[in-house]
From Swiss-Prot:
Transmembrane segments: none
Biased composition (Acidic residues): 37-51
Protein name: UPF0329 protein ECU04_1660
Basic residues bias: start-end ranges: 13-23
Domain of life: Eukaryota
Residue span of region Disordered: 1-74
Family under the similarity heading: Belongs to the UPF0329 family.
Segments of skewed composition (Basic and acidic residues): 1-12, 24-36
Native source organism of the sequence: Encephalitozoon cuniculi (strain GB-M1)
Length: 269
């Protein structure tokens, strides 16, 4: 009897594995169909990015339903995979771009990818976008149709510091409405408009930030020798006038790689 039970158990496990295999093949086939229709970008998987896990001092959030907000969150957004890919290595990004649907990104050199990664790999901004303070830092545009989807943009003023240089520009956010009614971020980057000279402030230009045809922390003290916990790559600070992200070397946090400061929009009186 015991041997029979074991046989049944093995059989049931085998069936379970077969079912999972079929599901994976079906998903791959479905993605292939969407690429053929030119709609791969809209149909691809979106994700709720746990920003708290990437920034120092953040608590790991509990799993929540797509429409459920975390404590302190005002806006609920999902993130498209074309935004998340910029968190990967330059080599991996190049591979995905060369084999992707967006022709303008194909054939880029590793050097170009690394330059673009500095401008696009700013997913920590999501913490501000989801917060109640979002509208104090970002201006919204009206909705419009493009590539078969309803879209809109959000634009903020930012200063990117890297290698001793400051660049002034816009923090661009592109969104579209998913089939389930959720708001999905498909474009996120810092777009330089000028180099900041000493004694001068930001002079960004606000405009539509959409080049995609079809959607397929305060001053940081020296902590030499300190290492971030696994998965943490930045520190975030926020005040009434600015939201600051500092990216440091994960093995030695005394080495600052770059920083991005999003400035509050001046109130019009």
């Amino acid at each position: 009897m015991e041997e029979r039970e074991r046989g049944k158990e093995k059989g049931s496990k085998g069936k379970g594995r077969k079912k999972r295999g079929k599901k994976g093949a079906g998903e791959a086939k479905e993605e292939s169909k969407e690429e053929d229709r030119g709609e791969e970008e809209e149909e691809s998987v979106e994700a709720d990015v746990p920003v708290e896990e990437m920034a120092a001092g953040g608590a790991r959030p509990k799993k929540k339903s797509p429409k459920e907000k975390s404590k302190g969150e005002e806006h609920c957004y999902k993130v498209h995979k074309r935004v998340l890919r910029w968190m990967k290595s330059a080599e991996r990004i190049k591979y995905e771009l060369d084999n992707g649907e967006e022709e303008k990104w194909r054939g880029r050199s590793i050097e170009e990818i690394e330059e673009q990664k500095v401008l696009h790999d700013i997913t920590e901004v999501l913490k501000l976008l989801r917060s109640k303070e979002c509208d104090k830092f970002f201006a919204r545009t009206g909705k419009y149709m493009k590539g078969g989807s309803e879209r809109w943009n959000m634009v903020g003023v930012g200063i990117l510091e890297e290698g001793g240089k400051k660049r002034v520009g816009n923090v661009e956010v592109g969104l579209f409405e998913g089939k389930g009614g959720e708001n999905i971020i498909y474009h996120l980057m810092f777009k330089p408009t000028d180099f900041e000279e000493e004694g001068e402030g930001a002079r960004p230009s606000f405009g539509r930030c959409d080049g995609v045809d079809a959607i397929e922390e305060g001053r940081i003290s020296d902590m030499s020798g300190f290492q971030y916990p696994p998965g943490v790559r930045s520190e975030i600070t926020s005040s009434g006038s600015e939201f600051r992200i500092v990216w440091k070397n994960q093995r030695d946090t005394s080495l600052v790689l770059r920083s991005l400061t999003v400035l509050r929009i001046p109130e019009i009186r």
